[in-house]
């Protein structure tokens, strides 16, 4: 199963309001395993953006940009300030690693 299919399924599940972690083949579960730079480098900029924002969505973040609002529902969100989103140690590290790979790839 490729990352795109897993992201699509995860996006559908995220809209259910369930506060659960997303797990990705080749990466692991975003709230209990560290993603590796090597594994993340296999993804596209779009996939990296989606995985990173899924972490914020599952933790209650209300997206501000039109792109994110169109990709992720703000239904059930309750945190407007991204800095106030409580991420566990795995999620924080995974977001940082994703951002590092996005930067190295020149993602916008």
What is each stretch, according to the model?
Residues 63-108:
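Compact alpha-helical subdomains of small soluble proteins
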Residues 15-18:
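N-terminal signal peptide c-region/cleavage motif recognized by signal peptidases
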Residues 39-73, 77-78:
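Amphipathic alpha-helical packing elements
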Residues 8-12:
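Hydrophobic helical h-region of N-terminal Sec-dependent signal peptides
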Residues 27-37, 77-82:
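Acidic/histidine-rich, surface-exposed loop or edge segments in extracytoplasmic proteins
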């Amino acid at each position: 199963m490729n990352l795109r299919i897993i992201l699509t399924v995860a996006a559908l599940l995220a809209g259910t309001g369930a506060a659960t972690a997303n797990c990705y083949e080749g990466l692991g579960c975003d709230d209990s395993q560290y993603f590796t730079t090597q594994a993340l480098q296999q993804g596209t900029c779009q996939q990296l953006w989606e995985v990173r924002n899924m972490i914020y969505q599952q933790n209650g973040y209300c997206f501000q940009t039109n792109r994110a609002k169109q990709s992720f529902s703000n239904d059930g969100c309750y945190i407007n300030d991204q800095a106030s989103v409580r991420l566990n140690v795995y999620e924080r590290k995974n977001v940082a690693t994703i951002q590092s790979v996005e930067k190295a790839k020149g993602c916008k």
